[in-house]
Amino acid sequence: MSKLVLILNCGSSSLKFAILDPATGEEKLSGLAEAFFLPEARIKWKLNGEKGNADLGAGAAHTEALNFIASNILTDELKNSIAAIGHRIVHGGEKYTQSVIVTDEVVKGIEDAAQFAPLHNPAHLIGIREAFNAFPHLKDKNVVVFDTAFHQTMSEEAFLYALPYSLYKEHGVRRYGAHGTSHYFISREVAEYVGKPADQVNAIICHLGNGGSVSVVRNGQCIDTSMGLTPLEGLVMGTRCGDIDPAIVFYLYKTLGMSMEQIEETLVKKSGLLGLTEVTSDCRYAEDNYDNASKPEAKRALNVYSYRLAKYIGAYMAVLGDDHLDAIAFTGGIGENSAHVRELALNHLKLFGIKIDNERNLAARFGKDGVITTDDSAFKAIVLPTNEELVIAQDTARLCF
């Protein structure tokens, strides 16, 4: 068996894991451990096509999950083939523009950036520490891949906020973006799709899932992206509000008497599609009930969602200026599967000569890629499944093998 990479994506209460062959992209194992610290902590996995699941024990967390993976799921052959471990890290601040091997200095850098990702970075550090314990022979073969790295090519005019400049220089307050690993992967997929070298492709990439972001790529490099200092800015998301008037925070605090904790919970966990429907954060509810007159919240939510998305796409078309736009790409759970969202958003962009092909749009779902615009559309729109795990595996292999 060839050299394999174990990929870990640690959240505060969950752990996604996979084992990939970085040379072929073949997935040997995938799984999810969830409900950490709760009585129902559990783990499920798929190994060589066979599915399994187990209880981890009440209160179990990252340590128990990784120990279970190493002791109960991995075969000896698979365990011996793991040559390195790749970790997804949400925020690397300005310091990290590419993936790096884990050192004490890197751990310190992840800790420093935790102020901008307080839920994610501390959990990632737990994952690194527990990986050291579970696989001690691979301690110098751990690699971190940053969601923010791809966006570090943005210029000041794109990443600065119109705040006192000292807030940036002294405290790092600026746009960082997120989903960079996915945006990077899709930019390369677009290049292959349109037959151009990766360093010459110009694209607008819409990563739409429970979280969502748009980036604009010129000559293979990100020049702007919708998420900001944190992943709260930008698009309407599952539970996150995206762009709002900052003075709304003052209003909620001063006039409605909400605490800062309540305001944060509202903007991060109670807004977006959940806030607009007041039912669910699941986009499928809004799609399924879009024309149901008894559930007007569905149409309201999907219209606001798609309108915001169209605004970003249009703005980024302007940002490209004279550079030819090779494609608008849709990826992520919603981007890959919601023909309705794509149709609503692109129909706002008829001014640019974009024409959606309804049959192609409906065909490009459920894992199928494809162009969804007509042959005479001024610009192509493409659906492309993302593969962040493959990027992590390949970066890890590049640094360790």
Curated annotation (Swiss-Prot):
SUPFAM superfamilies: Actin-like ATPase domain (SSF53067). Pathway: Metabolic intermediate biosynthesis; acetyl-CoA biosynthesis; acetyl-CoA from acetate: step 1/2. It catalyses: acetate + ATP = acetyl phosphate + ADP. It is an enzyme of class 2 (transferase). This is Acetate kinase. Substrate binds at residue 88. GO terms for biological process: acetate metabolic process; acetyl-CoA biosynthetic process. It comes from the Bacteria. Mg(2+). Can also accept Mn(2+). Catalyzes the formation of acetyl phosphate from acetate and ATP. Can also catalyze the reverse reaction. InterPro entries: Ac/propionate_kinase (IPR004372), Aliphatic_acid_kin_short-chain (IPR000890), Aliphatic_acid_kinase_CS (IPR023865), ATPase_NBD (IPR043129). Belongs to the acetokinase family. GO terms for cellular component: cytosol. Its cofactor is Mg(2+); Mn(2+). PANTHER family: ACETATE KINASE (PTHR21060:SF21). Keywords: ATP-binding, Cytoplasm, Kinase, Magnesium, Metal-binding, Nucleotide-binding, Transferase.
